[in-house]
Curated annotation (Swiss-Prot):
HAMAP family: SurE (MF_00060)
Protein function: Nucleotidase with a broad substrate specificity as it can dephosphorylate various ribo- and deoxyribonucleoside 5'-monophosphates and ribonucleoside 3'-monophosphates with highest affinity to 3'-AMP. Also hydrolyzes polyphosphate (exopolyphosphatase activity) with the preference for short-chain-length substrates (P20-25). Might be involved in the regulation of dNTP and NTP pools, and in the turnover of 3'-mononucleotides produced by numerous intracellular RNases (T1, T2, and F) during the degradation of various RNAs.
Native source organism of the sequence: Salmonella paratyphi B (strain ATCC BAA-1250 / SPB7)
GO molecular function: 3'-nucleotidase activity; 5'-nucleotidase activity; exopolyphosphatase activity; metal ion binding; nucleotide binding
Protein name, as recorded: 5'/3'-nucleotidase SurE
Length: 253
C-alpha cells in the first residue's frame, strides 16, 4: 500500500511523525506536509504565489508556506511517484468534531485527496497525549481497507479518544454533531499601542446526541464519520424552487 500522508499541524508535529513511523511498518509512506502549523486553513489553495519544497534526510517533504490542500495537490500530482493508493491526513492535535470539519485543515487534506480521486482518511486525537492509540486505530483501519476496499466514495473522518489503547471501547459510525457559534475574540495590545486580535476557542456543543461524533468520543469510542465533497442540500431543492416562484425572482428574464 502506498500512502500519501499530510496534516495541518506541520511536518514536525508529533501526530504525523508518530503515524508515519507506525505506517512504515507495513506501507510505503510519503510525508508531504506544511512547514509550519496551518490549523484552520480549511480547503485554501495557494494560487497567487509559487510554492517551494524542502526534503529532509528521511524523505519527508515540507511545503514552505503551503496549506494542507497544497500539500496533497502537490503530493498527488508531482511529488509521489508512483502515485499513492490512499491519502491519509493526521494525526491532528485535538479533535475535529461536528462543524469543526468546516475549518479543519486536517479534514481538508483528506477532502483534496478524495477530490483528486483517491480514498481518503482524516484522523484526529481528542487531546494531545496518546498519539500511539490513534496510530494503532489508523493502522487497523488501513489494513482493513487493504483487505477489502470501502467503495463508498466518501472521506472517513476519524476521531480517537485520548486514552490508552486498552481503554478504547470500540468503534462507532457516527454523524457530525454541531456547536454553538463561536463568538469570543481576545484583544491584546502590542508595544506600540496597537490592538491585536486572537480568534477565541470553538463554541460549546449544541447537538451532541447519542449518534453523533461528540457522544462517541466522550463515551470512549472511536468515531468514524463518512463525509462527502458534494455540498448540495438536495432536500432543499424544491423549497428553494417554490420560493423563487412565489417571490417572482427570475420571471423577468
Amino acid at each position: 500500500m502506498r500512502i500519501l500522508l499530510s496534516n495541518d499541524d506541520g511536518v514536525h508535529a508529533p501526530g504525523i511523525q508518530t503515524l508515519a513511523k507506525a505506517l512504515r511498518e507495513f506501507a510505503d509512506v510519503q510525508v508531504v506536509a506544511p512547514d509550519r502549523n496551518r490549523s484552520g486553513a480549511s480547503n485554501s489553495l495557494t494560487l497567487e504565489s509559487s510554492l517551494r519544497t524542502f526534503t529532509f534526510d528521511n524523505g519527508d517533504i515540507a511545503v514552505q508556506m503551503g496549506t494542507p490542500t497544497d500539500c496533497v495537490y502537490l503530493g498527488v500530482n508531482a511529488l509521489m511517484r508512483p502515485r499513492p493508493d490512499i491519502v491519509v491526513s493526521g494525526i491532528n492535535a485535538g479533535p475535529n468534531l461536528g462543524d469543526d470539519v468546516i475549518y479543519s485543515g486536517t479534514v481538508a487534506a483528506a477532502m483534496e485527496g478524495r477530490h483528486l480521486g483517491f480514498p481518503a482518511l482524516a484522523v484526529s486525537l481528542n487531546g494531545y497525549q496518546h498519539y500511539d492509540t490513534a496510530a494503532a486505530v489508523t493502522c487497523a483501519l488501513l489494513r482493513g481497507l487493504s483487505r477489502e476496499p470501502l467503495r463508498t466514495g466518501r472521506i472517513l473522518n476519524v476521531n480517537v479518544p485520548d486514552l490508552p489503547l486498552a481503554q478504547i471501547k470500540g468503534i462507532r459510525v457516527t454523524r457530525c454533531g454541531s456547536r454553538h457559534p463561536a463568538d469570543k475574540v481576545i484583544p491584546q495590545e502590542d508595544p506600540r499601542g496597537n490592538t491585536l486580535y486572537w480568534i477565541g476557542p470553538p463554541g460549546d456543543k449544541y447537538d451532541a446526541g447519542p449518534d453523533t461524533d461528540f457522544a462517541a468520543v466522550d463515551e470512549g469510542y472511536v468515531s468514524v464519520t463518512p463525509l462527502h465533497v458534494d455540498l448540495t442540500a438536495h432536500s432543499a431543492h424544491d423549497v428553494v424552487s417554490d420560493w423563487l416562484d412565489s417571490v417572482g425572482v427570475g420571471t423577468q428574464w
